[in-house]
Structure formats: C-alpha cells, structure tokens
C-alpha cells in the first residue's frame, strides 16, 4: 500500500507546477490554523483561565469566520486579478494568526479566531480556479488535489508539531508558526503564481445565477452530508481509540499522524482517479466505501488494529472526495466559479459542525463511542444518495 501511494504521488506531483506548490503552502497554513486547536485547547483554557467548553468556542469562531468570509470575500473581490486576491488572503492569514499569538485575553483571541477563519474558504475558492487554469490538459483534478495536499500535510505533521510546541513552549508560539507559514505562502504566491486575469464579471446577480440549477445544490449536499457523517465519528476518534479500542493515551500522537497519512494518501488517489475516470465515479465509490467503513467501525471498534485500519481508510475517504467535489462544483458554477468553490468549504465546515453535534448525541445518552459511527454511516449514505441523484439527473458529466 505504501509503495503504491509513493509511486502514485511521484507520478502525480512531478513535474509539479510551482504555482500549485504555492497554493499548497497556503492550504497548509489554513489546515494547521483550523485543526491545531483540537490539540492545544487544554493549554489555552489553562492559560486564559476559561473552561474547556468556553475554549471550544474558539473552534466555532473559526468555522463561523469560514462561513461568513468565503462568500463575502469572493463577492467583494470578484473583479480583481486572481493573484491579487490570493495575496490579500495570505495577508489575512498572517494578520489573524499573529494577532491570535499576541492576544491578551480570551475575548481578543475569540475575535482573532474569527478573523483567521475569514480567508479560509475564499482561498480554497480562488485557489481552485487558479489550479484549474494552470493545470495541464486532462489533469485538472490532480492540480486541485496538489493544492489540497497542504491541508493533509497539516494534519500529518503540522498539527502534531503545533501540539508539541504548545506543550513545550506556549500555545502562542503555535499561532506564531502559522503566521510565519502564511508569510512563506504569501512570498511563494508573489513569486510563483502567474498574473492570471480576473474572471469575467457577471455582476452581483450573475454570481448567484448558477444556484438556480439543482446541480450545485446536489454537489454541496453531498459535501455537507458526506463530511458530516465522517465527522460524527472523527470528532470523537481520540476517546474511541483509548476507551473502546484499548490504545494508551500516549499512542494518540501516532494515531493522529496515521489518520493524517490516510488523508494524504486519499487526496492523492482521489485526484489521480478523478482525471483517469470521472469525478462522479470517484465520489460515488468513495462515499460508499466510507459508509461501509463506518459500519465496520461500529462492529469492530473493540478490535484494536481493525479499528486502526478502518480509521485510516475512513480518513482517506474524507479527502479522496475533496478534489473531485471541487471540480464538480467548478463545472456547475460557470459565471460564479469562485463563489461555488468557496461554498464547498462552507458546506464542509457546516458538515463538521453538524457531525460533531450529532455524533455527540449517543455519547450524551450513555452509549459507547462506537455508536458515533452509526449516525455517521447514515449521513454518508444520504450524501451518496445526493451524489447518485446528481449522476442520474446530469448524466452528460459521466460521458464527457
């Protein structure tokens, strides 16, 4: 498996366009800013004298920033050259995380987490358009997957590193590293992203015209429900691995890294096969696999290494659908491509929030952590149903 993934990564990524590397650095900074909070939450709570639930609002503030900033930034900046928008967004990454590192109290940090989330969805939206434009013929999904690979590397290495630094030094240093990474991304965007012209201005109303069709709504529903289903389980993967699967707390760092490896491998595989076959087929197959894996987790979570293997498979599915779904929304949002691609991130984050809430319900009723996988499987099945309706309603995409 590792040999297959390594060979596939080589075939996909080399020779790699420098512009895509610049985009990947940006998504790495965003991925670390979003997900490192799960690891440093206790340190922040102790430092600022707040409870864990209050500190948890820092995660919600970031997600709210994503949902608010994605459509707003794209609509305001729709007439600007794409490179200029990316530079402004990386500047916002630097500002939000640098100010978070210097926050004197909880409320300032809460506000800065909101600011840090503002560029997230817009960067993915603009970045997806740039990746599609610079991609070689027949390799559009691979180009988008290279951009997204930064997010997976953040989960594989960035989050464990940030968690370690928070414990060894201070959580402020972790946010400082994210700001520095944002500065590196800004420099690479400045040097390597070509001066692409702005997209044709279809006006404010024209940006929303694509939403009159059912196609983008079906894609967004597939994103929200599919990711929400996986996050029903993944939001509680750490206590599940310790209390149900029988791993030690000391093993969690390695377990999180293995989950990140699954994300990395899934992203590479998804981009490759979306170009080789079609994005629709990859989405359909991957969501079906994720549904079966979650059912397997429910029945097999007490078997230590089976639970670990199913975790890697499910996190691979989480990112295997990412670039195919981005490509599908670009194909179905002509005239509002940046808004469409940004809305994918909104749907992703809404799915995360919904999944974390629904997954917590069986735990709150005294059931075991493995029960989080049951509503997760149901949500993924609904996401796959939305994808199947899309495929049947718009078969021309399967035949292009």
Please name every model-derived segment.
Residues 112-150:
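Cytoplasmic helix-loop-helix junction between adjacent transmembrane helices
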């Amino acid at each position: 498996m590792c040999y297959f993934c390594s060979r596939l990564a080589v075939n996909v990524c080399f020779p790699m366009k420098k512009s895509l590397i610049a985009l990947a650095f940006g998504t790495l900074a965003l991925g670390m800013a979003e997900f490192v909070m799960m690891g440093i939450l206790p340190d922040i709570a102790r430092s600022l004298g707040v409870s864990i639930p209050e500190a948890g609002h820092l995660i919600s503030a970031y997600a709210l920033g994503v949902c608010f900033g994605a459509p707003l930034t794209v609509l305001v900046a729709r007439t600007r050259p794409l490179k200029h928008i990316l530079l402004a967004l990386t500047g916002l990454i630097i500002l939000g995380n640098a100010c978070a590192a210097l926050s004197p109290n909880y409320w300032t940090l809460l506000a800065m987490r909101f600011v840090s989330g503002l560029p997230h969805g817009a960067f993915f939206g603009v970045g997806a358009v740039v990746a599609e434009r610079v991609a070689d013929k027949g390799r559009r999904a691979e180009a988008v997957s290279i951009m997204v690979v930064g997010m997976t590397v953040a989960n594989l290495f960035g989050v464990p590193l940030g968690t370690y630094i928070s414990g060894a030094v201070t959580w402020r240093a972790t946010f400082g590293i994210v700001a520095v990474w944002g500065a590196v991304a800004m420099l690479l965007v400045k040097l390597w992203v070509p001066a692409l012209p702005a997209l044709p201005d279809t006006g404010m109303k024209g940006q929303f015209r694509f939403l009159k069709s059912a196609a983008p709504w079906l894609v967004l529903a597939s994103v929200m429900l599919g990711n929400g289903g996986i996050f029903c389980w993944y939001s509680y993967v750490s206590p599940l691995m310790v209390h149900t699967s029988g791993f030690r707390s000391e093993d969690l760092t390695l377990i999180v890294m293995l989950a990140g490896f699954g994300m990395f491998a899934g992203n590479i595989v998804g981009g490759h096969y979306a170009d080789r076959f079609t994005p629709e087929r990859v989405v359909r197959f991957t969501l079906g696999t994720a549904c079966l894996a979650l059912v397997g987790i429910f029945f097999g979570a007490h078997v230590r290494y089976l639970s670990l293997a199913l975790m890697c498979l499910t996190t691979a599915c989480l990112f295997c659908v990412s670039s195919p779904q981005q490509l599908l929304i670009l194909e179905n949002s002509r005239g509002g491509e940046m808004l469409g691609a940004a809305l994918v991130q909104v749907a992703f984050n809404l799915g995360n929030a919904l999944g974390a809430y629904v997954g917590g319900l069986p735990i709150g009723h005294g059931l075991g952590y493995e029960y989080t996988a049951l509503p997760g499987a149901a949500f993924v099945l609904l996401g796959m149903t939305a994808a199947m309706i899309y495929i049947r309603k718009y078969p021309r995409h399967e035949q292009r």
